[in-house]
Amino acid sequence: MANISQKYAQALYDVAEEQNLTDDILNELDQITISVKGLLREVRAIDNNPKLAKNERQQFVENVFKGVSKPLLNTLFLLANNSKLSLIPEIDGDYRKIYNQVHSQDLMKVESVYPLSNEELDEIGKAFIKRTGLKKLILENQVNDSLIGGIRVSIGTKVYDGSIQNDLNQLTKSFQQMK
């Protein structure tokens, strides 16, 4: 399914870029995804209902998603007609990946034992901007008591682990290899 959602996301991004709506659609798609995630079972039921005619599916989209930009609405019509509305969360994720790549930015999750201040997050962000070469990092702090101390940073698929828990794990492995 990932390839299908990537194709929809890329097509939507291309149209959004032509119309200078990439930011607007990113925000609209995020809002729609939040709504759809809570109703995924119902959305799948709509996708899997062979008795729903195309005009009924389009009417559903018009009623539920009114007010969204034209390119996004057309994509939602296409998803409804192809019984793929349940792919909205995946399309949102793929659209965000494309958006982040084009804008040379990414999400940076910083795990710490306690909530970090904005100043601390900014300093960590600046260090990782230099390290990664990205123009911007979207910072998110998550509290993780199991780290004992230090931080663990995730950017995309890369993890930078500077936690005491990781140091202890590495030390344990070293001792086990000595046996």
Task: Please place each PLM-identified region on the residue numbering.
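Elongated, mostly alpha-helical coiled-coil "stalk/stator" tethers of large membrane protein machines
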Residues: 1-179
